Amino acid sequence: MTFAEKGKHVRSVLQLSQEKFAIMLGVSFATVNRLENGHAVPSYATMEKFASLCKEHNISFD
């Protein structure tokens, strides 16, 4: 599963708009949009926040 697919899945599970998801990750709406469309690679800091968010909401990709 790509990061784009994981991002869309987590956002769907949490029922968040791209705007609200961006706020939770500390990035812009445009960044979330590019990440979900596979046009960008997440920074290490974004990946850490994403992992923390998944852990906080008991979302696993195992």
What are these language model-derived features?
Residues 1-2:
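A detector for short, charged/polar N-terminal pre-domain segments
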Residues 15-33:
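Short alpha-helical DNA-recognition segment
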Residues 5-7, 33, 45:
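Solvent-exposed, flexible loop/coil residues
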Residues 44-62:
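DNA major-groove recognition helix of helix-turn-helix/homeodomain DNA-binding modules
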